[in-house]
Amino acid sequence: MMLPSHSPRPWPARAGLPRVDTARALAALTLLAAALASPPAGADTRTLCTIVADAASGRVLAERGEGCATRVTPASTFKIALSLMGFDAGVLTDAHAPVLPFRAGYPDWGGDAWRQPTDPARWMRYSVFWYSQQLTQRLGQARFASYTQRFGYGNADVAPGPGEFAGMKGAWNSGSLRIAPREQIAFLRAIVNRTLPVSAHAFEMTDRITLIDAQPDGWIVHGKTGTSSPGDDGRFDRARAYGWFVGWAARGTRAVVFAHLIQDDAPHDVSAGLRARDALLAELPALALPAAGAVPPAR
């Protein structure tokens, strides 16, 4: 299946890179360094990790923060993996099927947006937790665990157990499943380079429903936010919330993958995931560094 014209392919063709404009590269590098050295708005939010890497080579363009190797809950960023599973297994068929109805008793802490009939595109856009649960139930525990293992996704621990959100009921939501930002980068590169053990249709549909929008300088961004907190019982602590934004950005033959993780030290009105997304997207022009301008990871 071919992607529609409005959703360009996010992976680079095997072609030579354009000539590097040294002055532009140095200016962009300076901007990126300044951006990564600055914490998100608000003294009560910490940047645990920001990584940007070339999708084709894996070369790290920038790395900052002391939490890049530390595993935490993936929260709703795991929907990218769930999308690949669902489309590969045939549980999901296209961006608008299946449409599942909201039923009394489903999690609805996301408000009215979660109390609507939901299809895969709406699920990803509004991060509808109960749709994830319905997907994993249709996969079944064995297939769900097998996919997670084969994806090499963090600790791949989605084993069933006691608790409201154990196993396929929500292991990714402050549960047993954990992943580090560096592991997110490896997983995202496998998506961009299409090396995961799933069908072309699964890649194409996941690409379609994760599209964010076009950014300055012609970059096309795909990604997913996530908001959760420490612990393994699915309970949310607003005063210590994690905020993720992970994904990939492409322009022409170049693609980068990114993972940005923050943590709050006090409650906020706007979710940590949305704030992580906005902070990362604001710096996207600086992420458009040519490969020759790459820098080693900051330690």
Give a label for each model feature.
Residues 43-62:
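Short N-terminal segments immediately surrounding and downstream of signal-peptide cleavage
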Residues 63-69, 116-117, 125-132, 163-173, ...:
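Flexible glycine/proline-enriched surface loops and loop-helix/loop-strand junctions
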Residues 88-105, 198-203:
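Short, well-structured active-site flanking segments
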Residues 111-120, 134-193:
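Mid-domain, small-residue-enriched loop/turn segments at the edges of structured enzyme/sensor domains
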